[in-house]
Amino acid sequence: MGNKKVGVFGATSLVGRCLLPLLVKSGWNVKAYSRREVNSTDPGIQWVQIPKSPDDLHGPACESDQISFWISLAPIWILPDYFPMLVKYGARRIVVVSSTSIFTKSHSGSAEEKSTAPKLSTAETRLEQWSAETGIEWIVLRPTLIYGRGMDKNITEIVQMIRRLGFFPLL
C-alpha cells in the first residue's frame, strides 16, 4: 500500500461499505472507525471501534499516527465530539456528509423529522467555526437520499414491487 492515509468515521454505513474498497483500490491506507466491532482482515483497512466517550480516542496513539485526510459518514452532529482527536491526528482536510434535510425537514409535520434540521445546522456551523480556528480545510456534501444494496427498507420494498408488478402505482 502507499503512504497515503485516510480516517473514515461511519465506516460500516452504506456509503462506508461502498467507499472503503474504492479507497484501498486507489492506494489509500484506511483507518476505519465504527461504533460496531468489526472483525475483518481487509488489506489496507485498520478497523477501530469508537468507544462511548470520544475522550478515550485522544491518547498518544493519535500523535504518533498522523492522518491528514478524513471522511465523516457518521451523523454530522456527533463529529464535534471528535474535533480534539482530529487535531491530535494532524487533520488537514475533512469531507463530511450531512443532508439536504437541513433545508427540507424544518417545516415537516413530524416532530422527529423537524428536530433533525437544527441538529444538522448546528453541527455544520460548529464544523465551519472549528475549521476556521484550526485552519483545517472542509467540505460538506448534502445528498438528498442515500440508498442501495438492499439496506434501505422503503426503497428495497418499492424496487421489489416494481420487479413483481412491472410498474409502481402512484396515487
Language-model features: locations:
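Flexible, glycine-rich beta-alpha linker
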Residues: 139-157
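N-terminal Rossmann-fold cofactor-binding loop
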Residues: 32-38
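SDR active-site strand-loop-helix element
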Residues: 9, 33, 73, 94-100, ...
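Active-site Tyr-X1-5-Lys
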Residues: 114-139, 151
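NAD(P)-cofactor binding segment of oxidoreductase domains
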Residues: 60-106, 118-129
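Rossmann-fold cofactor-recognition segment
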Residues: 43-56, 75-76
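A conserved pocket-lining segment of Rossmann-fold NAD(P)-dependent short-chain dehydrogenase/reductase
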Residues: 160-171
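N-terminal Rossmann NAD(P)H-binding glycine-rich loop of SDR-like oxidoreductase domains
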Residues: 4-26
